[in-house]
Amino acid sequence: MSRSWIAALSAIFLFPLAAVAGDLQHDAAAVFQPIDSSLVASVVKNNDVTPAKVELGRKLFFEPRLSKSQLLSCATCHNLSTGGVDAGPTSVGHGWQKGPRRAPTVLNAVFNVAQFWDGRAADLKAQAKGPVQASVEMNNTPAAVEATLSSMPAYVAEFQKAFPSDATPVSFDNMAKAVEAFETTLITPNARFDLFLKGDATAINDVEKKGLRLFIDKGCAGCHGGVNLGGAAYFPFGVAQNPSELIRPFADKGRSAVTKSSADDFVFRAAPLRNVALRAPYFHTGQVWTLEEAVNLMAADQLNETLTPDETGAIVAFLGTLTGDQPRIEYPILPPRGKDTPHPQY
């Protein structure tokens, strides 16, 4: 991303999207897309999603023995009961270490252009490998994960079923593929906003419609559009003015750590806003605890806008329409330890 590109983007953000008089549903349909399960197949690459992989991935998602301490699982930081995130500003990992950023939601993550706030993982397979190996998170190694899973006959049988053509089905790569397969099922369709996009004008009320109109016309949809209302591209954080050090620490340069380009300093993947009402606290630092504060902060720092309390309330009301049907996942009974299963290390 060049500095000229950022400058051009910033200029766009400082002015609202053109307010088009007319039908709100028509205008919204030009910017947003309802969730449809048929979209999943078009975005998952190099991984055939089968029922056997999904079932194996469900177990692995809840499997604490993927971590060195055998205390932490994917579900520890991505709690499916609380919007696919945990409750703190940043997650607590191995040895009670605190992570540097807020855990992104796993719900609808399959629709994101890439994973993590800085987009360093191209897909959910790559993302699944990261926390397992991160010293501040699960602090494990691929070899140790393979040894652990291979030590439990029930897992060996499930890997063989999920990857029948592989000579060595129990592998770190296949662990990640199974987790990805499961996570493709973690979508939240049928939000009231989806019903509105599909033609039901009564699905959202007048205040929520006002919030939607403001969301479009003020420029919020410039970053938060598409099926996930975000997650599709990268944008500088602090266009009109720099957020406070608490919200945007100077030491965290965002995407430039991935691209190695200073042009990407403080550039982050736009947060997807589906189910956002369930996911406080907000931003990559997790330092904003209410949607009202988050909306006002983004209006000021990104769009150079000062919202009235009524405008803020209307936008927050609209954001509440983005909560969809939450996944109904049965908590799995995991395979018992084998005689050679490694012991936990704290």
Which residues are covered by each model-predicted region?
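Bacterial N-terminal signal peptides
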Residues: 7-17
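Periplasmic c-type cytochrome electron-transfer domains
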Residues: 2-5, 19-346
